[in-house]
Amino acid sequence: MTEENRIYITHLKVTDVPWHRLTTAYGRGTDFPEHFAVLEQMRDLASVKESLYELTTNMEHQSTLWHATPFGMVFLCRILEKALADSGQNPVAHFLAGELLDFFACILQCFHDGDEMVHAEALPLFSDLLKEEYLWSEEYDEEEDELRYEEDEVFPDDLFYSFYYYSWQAVKAYQDVLEQVPAEFAQPAAAVLELL
């Protein structure tokens, strides 16, 4: 990982990302910041389950990753770090840590499956994913988006591969967190580390 990409990943703020212009499995990432906030609070199990479901089903669908996925992974890594730290005294945090580790293994498996196929090079910088030419329209129009999906090349090859590559890089940037998990999370963390 380049130092520039590592710094970008570790310093990125939720407000730096134009979520409403990033694709997900079921639309756009407009509501991602709200769901991250619910997960960060780790207060109410039902709310955490609902937000986690919304994020994970929109970030990965049938082994396909989306434009919002690598950015989502950055913030889920930070939330995992907090959940692991609080897991001993907060049952919601304990639940969330286990679920996130399983989801990370799923995302990394998607990266490896894609990486084994012939693919384009990733964009040189994580921040390149936010170049204007790759962002979708400012205003969300479901019909317009559906028409765009019918085009031959919805995403340029290097951009599409970058959804996978930078999702992997996001987790890699927080590898030290995975190496220091509480004992009860050692097995799922080891499964994630094996895929890094």
Tell me what each language-model feature is.
Residues 1-46:
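N-terminal "cap/leader" segments of large eukaryotic alpha-helical scaffolds
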Residues 33-45, 74-86, 176-179:
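HEAT/HEAT-like alpha-solenoid repeats
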Residues 45-57, 104:
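HEAT-repeat alpha-solenoid elements in large eukaryotic scaffold proteins
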Residues 48, 69, 73, 90-93, ...:
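Residue-level detector of extended alpha-helical repeat arrays and alpha-solenoid scaffolds
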Residues 58-62, 79, 83, 107-114, ...:
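Residue-level signature of the C-terminal ends
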Residues 67-76, 116-122:
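Short sequence/structural elements of tandem HEAT/ARM alpha-solenoid repeats
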Residues 94-109:
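Elongated alpha-helical scaffolds
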Residues 122-196:
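Eukaryote-biased recognition of C-terminal alpha-helical segments
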